């Protein structure tokens, strides 16, 4: 089969023939029809921020496709089922796994980092790592559901706990932030304020639910948030950038008792405001990582109710042979992509 192989940081991925994997007991072979190019893939291949367990390795952890073959002992699935692939393989034994937070498992084996991933015609995963994909959801949207979409949902639903009426600011309106705006509105936020340094991304955010857009390069951010909240500040700020300065900007806009949820990942240290301010205002700062498997049904419900529309979430569908160009465009934000999706079954 064909697969896009990673040989080292800052080197192009190599599309080559590799042996098709065989499912072992409890495993499933999935024929991949879509795999999203995630920011993590860019961090690994182009920026060299994260190492993989070994090289060469097949990257890609946002996969969706059709079950091709069942390993021994798999009886609750069948060949031909449409499925999405959960990106992490947890240990299943630790206290976090037993409490339903397996996405935080310290032994989580992420596809494309610890074992071969989904930038290939086929992938093998444990049966527990699959979710059924409804017939009315295309594979490319299913691929995004496995990470990009669900990560944003977890941040808004579980961590920010948006239930209705809140004023929410969303910092960074790229792929994750775009969906963060969408879910904040779908969950009932009374007012959603999008913040980004690109006017085109603010316009796009308004198209999926943002009531206001602020460009800090051309407007006074603090003053504008104060105006939009009658001087109170926002109930919740969600940061999708991973930049210390953006984190602090988001925190400054919180009302007393407000909550900041940080989704963006970066390597730089964040300095808290003076404790007199931080404690005195009873501010909360939370990290948000991944999502729980049980949250997928809530996302499906929002889609079926028409509150969430993923039809514009895919910028383009590329072949494996075009993966390096897709990675470049994601890294350079060329054309402000939401997500490029690779279809390994597609040929140039």
Task: Give the residues covered by each predicted segment.
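Glycine-rich beta-strand-centered segment in the early N-terminal region that forms part
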Residues: 19-35, 48-95, 134-137
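NAD(P)H dinucleotide-binding glycine-rich loop of Rossmann-like/cofactor-binding domains
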Residues: 91-171
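Mid-domain Rossmann-like dinucleotide-binding core that forms the NAD(H)/NADP(H) cofactor-binding site
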Residues: 137-219, 223
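Glycine-rich cofactor phosphate-binding loops and adjacent beta1-alpha1 units
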Residues: 160-163, 203-284, 347-348
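C-terminal hydrophobic helical "lid"/dimerization subdomain
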Residues: 248-252, 293-348
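Rossmann-fold dehydrogenase core element
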Residues: 259-261, 273-313
């Amino acid at each position: 089969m064909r697969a896009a192989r990673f040989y080292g940081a800052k080197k192009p991925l190599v599309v080559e023939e590799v042996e098709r994997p065989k499912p072992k007991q409890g495993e499933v072979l999935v024929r991949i029809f879509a795999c999203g190019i995630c920011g993590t893939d860019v961090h690994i291949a182009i920026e060299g921020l994260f190492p993989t367990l070994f090289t060469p390795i097949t990257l890609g952890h946002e996969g969706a496709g059709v079950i091709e073959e069942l390993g021994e002992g798999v009886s609750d699935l069948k060949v031909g089922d449409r499925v999405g692939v959960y990106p992490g393989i947890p240990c299943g034994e630790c206290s976090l796994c037993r409490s339903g937070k397996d996405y935080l498992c310290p032994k989580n084996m992420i596809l494309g980092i610890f074992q071969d991933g989904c930038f290939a015609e086929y992938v093998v995963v444990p049966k527990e790592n699959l979710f059924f994909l409804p017939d009315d959801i295309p594979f490319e949207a299913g691929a995004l559901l496995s990470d990009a979409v669900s990560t944003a949902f977890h941040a808004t639903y579980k961590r920010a706990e948006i239930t209705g009426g809140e004023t929410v600011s969303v910092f960074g309106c790229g792929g994750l932030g775009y969906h963060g705006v969408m879910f904040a509105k779908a969950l009932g936020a009374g007012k959603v304020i999008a913040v980004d340094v690109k006017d085109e991304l603010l316009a796009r955010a308004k198209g999926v639910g943002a009531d206001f857009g602020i460009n800090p390069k051309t407007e006074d951010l603090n003053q504008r948030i104060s105006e939009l909240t009658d001087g109170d500040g926002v109930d919740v700020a969600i940061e999708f950038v991973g930049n210390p300065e953006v984190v602090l900007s988001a925190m400054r806009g919180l009302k007393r008792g407000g909550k900041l949820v940080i989704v963006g990942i970066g390597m730089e240290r964040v300095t808290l405001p003076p404790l007199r301010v931080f404690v005195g205002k009873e501010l909360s700062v939370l990290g948000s990582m991944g999502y729980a498997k049980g949250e997928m049904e809530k996302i499906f419900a929002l889609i079926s109710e028409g509150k969430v529309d993923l039809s514009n979430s895919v910028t383009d569908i590329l072949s494996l042979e075009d993966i390096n160009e897709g990675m470049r465009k994601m890294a350079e934000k060329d054309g402000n992509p939401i997500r490029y999706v690779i279809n390994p079954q597609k040929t140039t």
